[in-house]
């Protein structure tokens, strides 16, 4: 355990950030999974709605600093490409 006061504060801050990041990443996985399930079911309308939601959540994660903008762009591109095949 740290002895320096500022390091004790950083430990608490880092833990809060870790939990927040974990929650956001979990939500991202959930919405992308929902998109893939809609795609697998062949429901184009539901897939488009899920695509829009996933894109929104990915952009939100970038703005919060959870993921890098290029990673979000790659993921959005991949799911958009999959949606275009239907």
Swiss-Prot record:
Q: What GO annotations for molecular function exist for this entry? A: small ribosomal subunit rRNA binding; structural constituent of ribosome
Keywords for the protein's UniProt record, in alphabetical order: Ribonucleoprotein, Ribosomal protein, RNA-binding, rRNA-binding
UniProt keyword Ribosomal protein present: yes
Q: Name one GO cellular component term.
A: small ribosomal subunit
User: Which Pfam families does UniProt cross-reference here?
Assistant: Ribosomal_S20p
Q: Which family does it belong to?
A: Belongs to the bacterial ribosomal protein bS20 family.
The record's listing under HAMAP family reads: Ribosomal_bS20
Biological role stated in the UniProt entry: Binds directly to 16S ribosomal RNA.
Task: Write down what this protein is called.
Answer: Small ribosomal subunit protein bS20
């Amino acid at each position: 355990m740290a002895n320096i006061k500022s390091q004790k504060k950083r430990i608490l801050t880092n833990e809060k950030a870790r939990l927040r990041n974990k929650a956001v990443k979990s939500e991202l996985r959930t919405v992308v999974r929902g998109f893939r399930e809609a795609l697998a079911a062949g429901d184009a309308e539901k897939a488009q709605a899920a695509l829009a939601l996933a894109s929104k959540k990915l952009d939100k994660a970038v703005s919060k600093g959870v993921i890098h903008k290029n990673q979000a762009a790659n993921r959005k591109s991949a799911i958009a490409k999959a949606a275009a095949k239907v």
